[in-house]
Amino acid sequence: MKLTDIKNGNLSAEWAEKGYELPKFDVEAVKAKTHAEPTWVHFGAGNIFRAFPAAILNDALNSGKYDRGVIVAESFDYEIVDKAYQPYDNLSLLVCLKSTGDIEKKVIASVTESLKADYSFGADWARLVEIFQAPSLQMISFTITEKGYGVAPADLERGLTPVLAMGKVTALLYERFKAGALPLTVQSMDNCSHNGDKVKAAVFAYASKWVEQGLVPAEFLAYVKDETKITFPWSMIDKITPRPDAKVQKMLADDGFEDNYTIVTEKHTFTAPFVNAEETQYLCIEDHYTNGRPPLELGGVLYCDRETVDKIEKMKVCTCLNPLHTAMSIYGCMLGYTLISAEMADEDLRSFIQKIGYIEAMPVVVDPGVLNPYEFIGAVINRRLPNPFMPDAPQRIATDTSQKLAIRFGETIKAYEARGLDKSNLVLIPLVLAGYARYLTGLDDNCQPFEISTDPLLAELQAIVAPLKVEAGEQDFSCLKALYSRTDVFGVDLYAVGLGEKIESMAKELFAGPGAVRATLHKYVKAR
């Protein structure tokens, strides 16, 4: 079985026998219609795109209620197009890995063209210009990571041929402006708060610079700032899409699916003709479009207003997912775990995050109305985190912890303050923060060194806890005041809100020698 069999019509009975879901629509007809009247271009040809936005559109096409595909453009790693898209007629296989052990396999046929978004690829760039000049184009979208929205001063000086993604997109928007100032929606689908504002700021930066340099008329800047023409909606996306997994690769090979190998590009992108991803997914988008949009609600997208998108983001980041991740990462690293799913089999750790979420954070959760916080956190604890197919590691999640604590825990503490709630209800959140001081020593619960994940404040914060030793006996913990009063790290001065002394007391227990992390965790979780 090969993906190219689908175009050739050479489909054996094996596809159905092995449980592979094939497209229910006329792939060639959709391709022709999309080429003639494109509606959607997506920048970022990585795994998350194929596993989520492209798969949603595939579901919409399978419904028979839509007839246009998506054109993908890659602005960074062009090998992905050459090696993971074009040899397979832009088809891919989505392998959905469920926590129950069940596996769904679906051919994704919604991507009709794959293009390299750079001037050095003349034909591809000319095609992108043609697409951006098309009145039918409704939306361009992105999964290029938060770093992809960066604007480098040097790139602003390259005129109308910048090399960074946002510069290229602005150049293409200029082509659309010249074609009649046609309307378009510019939609980030990256996992970062207020993502539409990041795209907007970048586009405005390039357009403003070009006007200043006399390269484009002032009307172009007015065009991208005119919300009747161009909009930059916010969205909240949530789905884990790891690298191609060796276990999945073997399972596909055993099925007789031949396109089962991993591709590693020179830029160290890990891709493949298949994508493995978790079953749970959320995509909530601000419904602010100027030229219509593809009906992605047919594939499960939730459209709402900007305020609701923001509430969903806060629900996830401050209560229902991210705080649990950070709690597990700090303690998981100290207890020697390398897989989040394995941590979920540890009763202390599982109870730890359950009680943080349900007992301590949920009383101040931001309820968006359109998604139930209890259902969301239930899916996290019961399906997502225990999923053995998701090889996520506490070491990865612990990266940049100093930049995450304020939003993931500080906001909850501030909400308790603002509402006049009893902060004695906060026990396990203080235990997470006490654990951070112990984590910074770089010693696990057996007092063996472990590699601390990268963090911009690591050396500075380690210097604060350096006087402390992991050993029994009396020692002076007053150095911790310099840590727990840091509003830049925790979002609040923990002493000013009445939690500093409680956290110090817990830290003393965690520093009491080998086995103290486990003993302290067990004590407080059981008592809670």
Task: Please identify what each model-predicted range represents.
Residues M1-F43, N47-R528:
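Substrate/ligand-engaging "lid" and interaction regions
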